[in-house]
């Protein structure tokens, strides 16, 4: 219902609506668990059930790992439905929002999966926590340059691996 109500506006203004995978925590048990669209087959089902080109899947690669899924597997299941990415690294436990390559996710496999599906959508670095400890303008500028370099290298790798 929610997305269907927004569709007329999406068409009128040429804006795509993205349905993102989520996770949540069980504080009593001290565990992270899946939530809306954390199962890639469920995610694909929701996008398909609306059957409109203005609805795409947004895969937050960090959320997928926290929910017990490998991002590359989710990418392959979502395929052409995937229109937006939230890219950041984590340790499979915490939503770290740090630069790719600074924690434990398998970026070789993730970029390969994106190339395999011919990914053409948005590529958003969601790395705000990386910048939390940067104190000066100079450090922040260096951090932004590093983030841009990593993002460009990832995009170039995806493009060079496309079949």
Where do the PLM segments sit?
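Alpha-helical packing segments of well-folded alpha/beta enzyme cores
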Residues: 2, 6, 110, 147-154
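Active-site acidic/histidine proton-transfer and metal-coordination neighborhood
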Residues: 1-56, 66-67, 161-162
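C-terminal helical cap(s) of enzyme catalytic domains, especially alpha/beta-barrels
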Residues: 135-162
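Short acidic/histidine-rich active-site segments
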Residues: 122-130
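Conserved, mostly hydrophobic/aromatic
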Residues: 17, 60, 85, 114, ...
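Gly/Pro-rich active-site loop or hairpin
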Residues: 28-44, 48, 63-120, 133-142
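Residues that line or immediately flank small-molecule/substrate-binding pockets and catalytic motifs
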Residues: 82, 89, 126-127, 162
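Short, well-ordered beta-to-alpha junction loops that form the rim of enzyme active sites
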Residues: 20-22, 61, 127-128
């Amino acid at each position: 219902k929610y997305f269907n109500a927004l569709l007329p506006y999406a068409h009128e203004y040429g804006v795509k609506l993205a349905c993102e995978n989520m996770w949540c925590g069980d504080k009593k048990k001290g565990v992270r668990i899946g939530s809306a669209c954390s199962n890639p087959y469920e995610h694909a089902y929701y996008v398909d059930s609306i059957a409109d080109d203005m609805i795409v899947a947004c895969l937050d690669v960090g959320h997928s790992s926290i929910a017990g899924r490998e991002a590359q597997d989710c990418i392959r299941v979502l395929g052409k439905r995937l229109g937006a990415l939230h890219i950041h690294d984590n340790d499979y436990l915490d939503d770290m929002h740090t630069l790719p390559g600074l924690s434990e996710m398998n970026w070789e496999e993730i970029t390969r999966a994106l190339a395999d599906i011919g990914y053409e959508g948005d590529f958003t670095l969601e790395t705000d926590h990386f910048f939390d400890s940067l104190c000066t303008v100079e450090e922040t500028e260096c951090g932004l340059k590093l983030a841009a370099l990593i993002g460009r290298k990832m995009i170039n790798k995806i493009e060079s691996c496309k079949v």
